[in-house]
Amino acid sequence: MTYVHPVTGRTYPLSEARWCADDGHYLNLAPAPGLRRAQIDATERSVWRYAAALLVDRAHAVSLGEGWTPLVAGEWDGGPVLYKLEFTMPTGSFKDRGMTVMVSYLRSRGIARVLEDSSGNAGASLAAYAAAAGLACRILVPETASYPKIAQIAAGGADVVTIKGSRQDVAEAALAQSTEIFYASHNWQPFFVEGTKTLAYELWEQLGFTAPDNVVVPLGYGSNVLGADRGFEELHRNGEIERRPRIFGVQAAACAPYATAFDAGTDTLVPTRIAPTIAEGIATTRPTRVAEVLHVIRQSGGSIVAVDEAEIVDALGRLARRGLYVEPTSAVAAAGLTRLLASGNIATDETTVLVLTGSGLKASATIGDLLQLAPRQDDR
């Protein structure tokens, strides 16, 4: 197996940890063989139950018990939905699914110090897995990142540095520092997507070894989109599913570069208005794997929708009243599902999975303000 340059086709051996090609372009992993049903390790209750499909020797696994998150049947706008509770991961977000595989690979290749840029969740996840692996860790975060996320990162022993400006400014600062410390970016290092592909394997197993009709996810850089596609593609190639699901990405309208490009019919970013959004976890202006994410969604038969701030707040409150306390970024997907059902793009007789990616515990102060929550005074 090798790294593969998606444009030139040049390959690089996996024996050397890389986050980009020699020309600075991102790299993918060559197609993997995947697994068949009989190869699942049913004794393992983490993503490593699918170790036979992962391109990392299990002997090097750094695990905190991530994965195998609940799939809960519910209702949304009059139709059935399956809530995938990724926010129940060890550090409170889906990022653990990719981080366990990426950190395991990096440690197996002798990497001792790692750098990441993050709005919060990826940083918290890398800090935790780096601590578990015994790696030194530096995390760059935007100065607007919520304090609970910063505290979670720092508690793991990481060196946390705030950067002025946008989420993109933070990414560029990390690139500038990548010459002195290994850039373990979940948006660049393809072993992260090797981990997020286990979302597809879990859904397949939890649904009785079938694929859903639709998967709806918040869309920032696109690691859930790419991971789900990689996993379902492996299952389809191995004859374990008859068809692959449609994948729908949802963005905040205030910061929707993918949605704008999708609507324009291009495979590159086009000029779009950018404004602040409460969905800070997906507020990226220049994602890395643009053509790839757009291709995956189009090929699946899905689409990308953008929702406004009021829709996000409404979905946030509705989810909370169903017992699903998620951060605003997760609520973006639910707001998008409302639009997709109303437009008929998703039908109520289809099996639809709504992926809830991050815990509300990371943003309680913000959620309290958005939903105008306050205790009632007891005047007795």
Task: Identify the residue ranges that each predicted region occupies.
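PLP-dependent amino-acid enzyme catalytic core
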Residues: 1-380
